[in-house]
């Protein structure tokens, strides 16, 4: 039987056309039977158990789109001839080179690569913790669950947010062609945008992270377990990774401690407007901290392997080794991407944290009052 369920319209969307989105009507003719799943009044609790899994899946979908955009951009940059090599920019007869040899394009691709690889590491780490939470027992299982709880809103929101940025950068690498449907990066961009909206908007992920997973979590156990893992990575990197990167991550953790203490104080004092204004900026900064953790961990593993494979070769000798040894080239790419992100992108984290601190001094009425001078559309 139909059970008085009807599709009343199909939505016309920006992207994701392979997935039909429609409006459904249940019981308009008062002939629809609903069935209770689980205990009465416990629906939200049950739903959140399901959402944890689907939110991670959304983050993985976003990572897939970002990874594809990066691969398309690298492939295009390798084959698109435009301009001369920067070392011959004043030579009129200099030959054209692939745009991947232009420093600005290399920087764009490196930024995309660094984001994609750190997101992949973090997503795999979360997936491993899910398995460990089921395989281990006692406190070890609970610690794995704590890490999963705190990472899921970060991965869902961070990966989906960056997917929009990464696909846009891939379009930029393609130039005008990227804006046309001749190349797939345009579709990747419009398809990925919905991922920051579905399964709880990224603003909701921020609220979930800061309130439920940290401030309202007993003794901040989730955060403390995660922090201990990061501190272990910093310790393991000693003597392998430059101290400047280790110290940056350590300082980043200390700033996070301080901001969370301040937010807890706001909550205890009932200053929820000030608190909630800053949960999304904090979630964005927190994700940067997680990516920095992954990159430091990556350097700790990749640097010794690269040194062993290249035997300290530099300049042309290093170029020759990388050309004939795919494994050496793999680790070289890992080291370059991680160092690039830690040196050029992670410093922005500290500006974001300062902005959160200074932003607490900005006071304005919530809701419509501040926009009263804006006419309605």
Short names for language-model regions:
Residues 216, 232-377:
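C-terminal amphipathic alpha-helical interaction region
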Residues 1-258:
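Internal glycine-rich alpha/beta core junctions
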């Amino acid at each position: 039987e139909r059970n008085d369920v009807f599709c009343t319209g199909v939505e016309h969307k920006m992207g994701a056309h392979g997935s039909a989105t429609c409006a459904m009507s249940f019981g308009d003719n008062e002939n629809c039977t609903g069935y209770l799943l689980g205990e009465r009044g416990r629906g939200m609790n049950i739903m959140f158990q399901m959402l944890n899994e689907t939110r991670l899946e959304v983050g993985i979908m976003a990572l897939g789109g970002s990874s594809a955009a990066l691969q398309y951009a690298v492939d295009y940059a390798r084959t698109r001839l435009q301009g001369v090599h920067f070392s011959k920019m004043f030579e009129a007869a200099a030959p054209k080179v692939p745009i991947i040899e232009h420093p600005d394009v290399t920087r764009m691709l490196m930024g995309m690569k660094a984001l994609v690889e750190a997101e992949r590491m973090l997503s795999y780490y979360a997936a491993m913790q899910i398995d460990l939470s089921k395989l281990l027992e006692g406190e070890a299982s609970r610690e794995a669950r704590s890490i999963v709880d705190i990472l899921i809103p970060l991965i869902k929101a961070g990966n989906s947010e960056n997917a929009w940025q990464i696909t846009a950068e891939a379009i930029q690498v393609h130039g005008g062609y990227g804006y046309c449907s001749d190349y797939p990066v345009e579709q990747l961009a419009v398809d990925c945008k919905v991922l920051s909206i579905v399964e709880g908007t990224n603003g909701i992920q921020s609220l979930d992270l800061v309130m439920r997973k940290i401030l309202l979590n007993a003794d901040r156990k989730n955060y403390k377990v995660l922090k201990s893992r990061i501190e272990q990575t910093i310790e393991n990197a000693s003597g392998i990774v430059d101290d400047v990167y280790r110290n940056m991550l350590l300082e980043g953790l200390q700033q996070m401690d301080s901001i969370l203490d301040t937010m807890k104080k706001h909550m205890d004092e009932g200053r929820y407007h000030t608190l909630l204004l800053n949960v999304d900026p904090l979630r964005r900064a927190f994700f940067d901290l997680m990516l920095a953790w992954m990159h430091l961990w990556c350097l700790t593993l990749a640097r010794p392997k690269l040194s062993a494979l290249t035997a300290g070769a530099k300049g042309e000798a290093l170029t020759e080794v990388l050309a004939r040894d795919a494994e050496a080239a793999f680790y070289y790419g890992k080291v370059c991407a991680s160092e690039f992100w830690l040196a050029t992108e992670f410093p922005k984290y500290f500006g974001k944290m300062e902005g959160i601190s200074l932003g607490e001094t900005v006071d304005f009425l919530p809701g419509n009052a501040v926009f009263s001078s804006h006419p309605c559309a």
